[in-house]
Amino acid sequence: MSRPKFTRVLLKLSGESLAGSQGYGIDPKTITTIAREIKEVVQQGVQLALVIGGGNIFRGLAASSQGMDRAGADNMGMLATMINSLAMQDALEKIGVATRVQSAIVMQQVAEPYIRRRAIRHLEKGRVVIFGAGTGNPYFTTDTAASLRAMEISAQAILKGTKVDGVYTADPKKDATATKLPRLAYIDVLKRGLQVMDATATSLCMDNNLPIIVFDLTTEGNIIKVINGEEIGTIVQGE
């Protein structure tokens, strides 16, 4: 078995990644598959934190464009991330992975409050920590929450699981001439408007030199491959 390249990482998943082929909600088979891959990572001694989006349940930005108050819509989106976080906790604990959910919004009956030192202690004890409710503030995406939490826990990289095997010059589903970019500088992502993470999240990573690795989550075994240093996606880092 390969020696892990990283000892502490943050895995960022979109809400849609939990929906599977149904496109909405949470697909039990899909979430179980992801949980098994996470278990394999933990068994290698890697400390892993998670941030999950909420787009499979509710999108605050989309709702605000339809006339809903943006702050209220974003609050609903944060609650959607908590639903996904609790679902992932259940999937992980059913296969024997100790997990803690920490929420940026106080909801003490279902999750711990976000406390940085406590989160780090959980990681040191081999528990998976799931950060829910984004940053706890409207107008900030879960990508930004992932960047913030990754820096707070001193993660060595953000692993962003997507539906494509990296970053392309254009949408490969719409443009047959699109080519994959195996390596990118943060500034190029910002200048070219590439769909890696939103500008705020990318800028945070750039300012703190935190690598972002974009990879295909839909192919089984890819999480462990990235952890072990296989270059299967796109790595975004300093020039």
UniProtKB/Swiss-Prot annotation:
GO terms for biological process: 'de novo' CTP biosynthetic process; UDP biosynthetic process. It is found in: Cytoplasm. GO terms for molecular function: ATP binding; UMP kinase activity. ATP binds at K12, L13, S14, G15, G55, R59, T162, Y168, D171. The keyword Nucleotide-binding applies. CDD domains: AAK_UMPK-PyrH-Ec (cd04254). Its EC number is 2.7.4.22. Gene3D superfamilies: Acetylglutamate kinase-like (3.40.1160.10). Keywords: Allosteric enzyme, ATP-binding, Cytoplasm, Kinase, Nucleotide-binding, Pyrimidine biosynthesis, Transferase. This is Uridylate kinase.
